[in-house]
């Protein structure tokens, strides 16, 4: 029993916890944040501390119970110090016992911001300029650098204005009638020229070697096309003539009179086989065959 009583007495005399939520929210020092937890103390060595008067300072006269009362968000702010290998970002956390703490440790947040006197103050007039805000404009991140690296200059104006102009075509070389006549004569005699012959012809006609070579290449292409067209026309003409001759020969065989074979004249069956022919409207031939057969009998 004495041991149990001593144990209860020891528990009753235990010191209160110094890092509870109530102690943190109800701190009496307006410009400091309590860091009593061992892990929080260790994190302070890495640059996590509370800095008063950082870049993000809340405006006095903010959320309050009455319009003319003191601001609920004070000037106390906690910021993250510079960590090695981390971004330089300031995070402001405003604290006030009247606004953030209540009975039972429940945080109450007003539904709207009451304005004193019913007059809306402009944001620029309510927020004083802070030197720390100017330092935030110089923040750079790795993704910003990559975007700047791959950005392309955009040109203003019509979309077709900045296109590369098309290449100018070379003017077509024009030859004189005398040059063309001499080239045609030489082409009819010789379709291909050697390098020495081409140089001599170019010198005689006062032309360059490249001009003579190009002219002969174009002329050979034209000659091949004309030759192919002429051959095709000749082939079609020959086919038409052949079909016409076949039709005429067929008509002659049909209209040619049948000569009676002297051997078959006296035999009616052989004579009938000899005179087999397609059906025709000519009744005179049929009558002649019947008369000849009757005569043979």
Swiss-Prot record:
It comes from the Eukaryota. One of its GO terms (biological process) is regulation of transcription by RNA polymerase II. Keywords: Developmental protein, DNA-binding, Homeobox, Nucleus. The keyword Nucleus applies. Seems to be involved in the development of cranial sensory innervation from peripheral ganglia. Residues 168-227 bind DNA. One of its GO terms (cellular component) is nucleus. It is found in: Nucleus. InterPro entries: HD (IPR001356), HD_metazoa (IPR020479), Homeobox_CS (IPR017970), Homeodomain-like_sf (IPR009057), TLX1/2/3 (IPR042247). Residues 153-174 are annotated as: Disordered. This is T-cell leukemia homeobox protein 1. The keyword Nucleus applies. It comes from Gallus gallus. One of its GO terms (molecular function) is DNA-binding transcription factor activity, RNA polymerase II-specific.
